[in-house]
Amino acid sequence: MMAVAAAQKNREMFAIKKSYSIENGYPSRRRSLVDDARFETLVVKQTKQTVLEEARSKANDDSLEDCIVQAQEHIPSEQDVELQDEHANLENLPLEEYVPVEEDVEFESVEQEQSESQSQEPEGNQQPTKNDYGLTEDEILLANAASESSDAEAAMQSAALVVRLKEGISSLGRILKAIETFHGTVQHVESRQSRVEGVDHDVLIKLDMTRGNLLQLIRSLRQSGSFSSMNLMADNNLNVKAPWFPKHASELDNCNHLMTKYEPDLDMNHPGFADKVYRQRRKEIAEIAFAYKYGDPIPFIDYSDVEVKTWRSVFKTVQDLAPKHACAEYRAAFQKLQDEQIFVETRLPQLQEMSDFLRKNTGFSLRPAAGLLTARDFLASLAFRIFQSTQYVRHVNSPYHTPEPDSIHELLGHMPLLADPSFAQFSQEIGLASLGASDEEIEKLSTVYWFTVEFGLCKEHGQIKAYGAGLLSSYGELLHAISDKCEHRAFEPASTAVQPYQDQEYQPIYYVAESFEDAKDKFRRWVSTMSRPFEVRFNPHTERVEVLDSVDKLETLVHQMNTEILHLTNAISKLRRPF
């Protein structure tokens, strides 16, 4: 489908290619999911604006050049003169004898309306003015996809358009006439009354057409005052401008590996900045993660004595503090990991054995990461019950603090709670909510993740306990978080999502959940207010995320639920039988 190619091109065009550094506008020296999301939103906006401006400028230049060439090359021939004379004679005929042929596509002039709407368009996606050759974001993405090859541009392919009609369903005839003019074939038409103010009907049109003709169709329809907006759709009825997200666990291989320097090389304040051996070690482990593909066994890391020493120092501290300050779910999982000889102070656990443990308990698994994922891609992984984990170890000179997540933070902070069913479900809910979310919503989700999964507190028998990985792997902030030196607020996703975050010192505010179940319920209600126009679910049997965008898919899901309910009903009946 041509729109799929356009959607893929969208992801390539707006990939993060800047180093995550202060020099490029990164908001702090310490890497965090929240700052990553903010930085990525800024860079994507800047990149999108630049790409669109360049494409529009090129289109304007090409159009002007074509006009000049045509003017220079067109010298009236005798045949042209004869045709002009014939046309003049026709115009002099009486009205009843001459009826002009209607244009294939006739649209009203709406220069004033376009001018008014431009001020409301987001930056980088403005409608073109009358002096602009005029390329919308849809057209630029489609044009880039079509430019892959001449065969692709000329081949007849399928597309889907959603057009919003301002003047009623009668405008549909003009759309169908335009499609016929550009040699398209309509396969499906569906309309409904619009929920958007000022719009009468929404119309979905599925058609077959070449990419070149589709571009011309979009440009023609866009100029009509009868249509409020028009969107080119990709698979699953998603707008091609919507952020790409993986549909299967294997597609996590396509997540953006950021083009950035390694943190020890970047920051003079990094504990390993002056240690060449440590910097080389970090680079080697990062390259292992870069080479990993879906289905591969997680590479074995032969940790050095120095790295094991660092692990031992942090492990013993957590072992001492957890019984008193960690939540019950964390303590139970920690004990289970010790019983299975995965958590021992004499060696670092390998990600493969930890992944096997999690899969057995909650269905979560691990995937090695270089620590260089976008916030969007990291959250997307959680939707598949996959946690992207680093394998490098913090510098030995700073065992109780690291400027970025390392394997000790992942192992001691995140892994135990990912073995708890309720917390694992909460983590996956955050991941599912991120799929197809806007950049601004990714910022909010990252902030919620930060104040819960990383620095969250919960109530337990009237006392405050920690469940955040950042707290459980950093005893200094753990003691601060449970003290009276900071403010404790009840967890409410709407307010948590906009809470400012700072990384220069310990947080002044922490959010306290009544329980994981309560946190999940509140989170689900908040997610339902997000702008994403579709719902998704994870199918654990196929490791695939399904977009619930059709009656057929909903019917299939209902049948599956009925089967599960039947099993539950049978189980209850058997339990009620007398011995």
Curated annotation (Swiss-Prot):
Tell me where on the tree of life, at the top rank, the source sits: Eukaryota
Pfam families hit by this protein: Biopterin_H
Residues annotated as coiled-coil are none
Please name the CDD domains in this protein's record.
Answer: eu_TyrOH
Swiss-Prot/TrEMBL cofactor(s):
Fe(2+)
EC number(s) per UniProt?
A: 1.14.16.2
Q: Where does Fe cation bind?
A: H409, H414, E454
Its Gene Ontology molecular function terms? iron ion binding; tyrosine 3-monooxygenase activity
Job description of the protein: Plays an important role in the physiology of adrenergic neurons.
What's the protein name?
Answer: Tyrosine 3-monooxygenase
Q: Which organism is it from?
A: Drosophila melanogaster
